[in-house]
Amino acid sequence: MRRVERVEFSGLWDPEPGWLNTASYGLPPRPAWEALQAALSEWRVGAMSWEPWDESTTRSRESFARLVGADAADVFVGSTVSAALAPIATALPDGAKVLTDDVEFTSNVFPWKVHEDRGVEVVGVPGEELVAAIRPGIDLVAVSAVQSSTGVVLDLPAVIAASKEIGALVVIDGSQAVGWLPLTVDGIDALVVHTYKWLMSPRGATLGYLSPRLQELCRPSAAGWYAGADVHTSYYGTRMDLAPGARKFDQSPSWFCYVGAAPALELIEQIGVETIQQHNLALANEFRDGLGLPPSNSAIVSTSLAGAQEAFASAGIRAAVRDGKLRASFHLYTTPADVHQALAALKPLQ
């Protein structure tokens, strides 16, 4: 696999060497950083109105829709994954059964579990057993496209096919996937993504897709002025005229977050997700090879090598520890030098 040379993206990032932690927090590209600084400068002196900032929300919605093959009318905006999933969980009938991975990130678990008092049951199984566990009696499958702790990439077509066969809803957390892994909403009922990881945006911007089927099933229980058909006439009073489509599920956006998100998402479109995937996997697999691991289809590498966390810390390499294992992640601003530095730090442990 050809490595996409970083010179192709030169000038877009200014990372200090050794950042291997995009799975925790992505680094902003220069256009996103500059847009955010400009908005902050306007705010500081009062030289602004919120409407231009809100144009970034529309741009983010439209860019996300293009990235995942959705209609922008089926995309909603918010701030967190768990809040975005709450209306779906509320719409589940009493006694519904939800299937998930037993190491699923809790933002895609707790929204379902808080309904256990009305009989909703959440069942977790090992990831390799997930597809086989999709059988009659399961009402909804809630799982990540890429697992946060391990980097395992979901067999999404198999999950969709098995769920369709029994009529189960498919709800995907794409926070560790969208931005580097080609993914569309075909066959998915809901896709929710926080943008501060692989979409390299400020924390506080979440984008989601709701299928027309789910839009009919769910109630916009967090509706506010921003969910109005005309936000300017939705400020006051008891009259409610909600927006059509998924926009009725919009939560009032944190504008600064979307000011940074819009140029970051548009840059990903410009570079191309397939190109990003190629770049990320080349570096991740170079790292895996140095550890004596076989190649993988993930930009996240997890290793249980004893002492790895301490070795990284001593070498100034920033990564994460998840479920007792070192987790390294590789994105557009990662360089071959970062990989070599990481392998050199771990070599005495092998």
Language-model-derived ranges and their functions:
Residues 1-350:
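Pyridoxal 5′-phosphate
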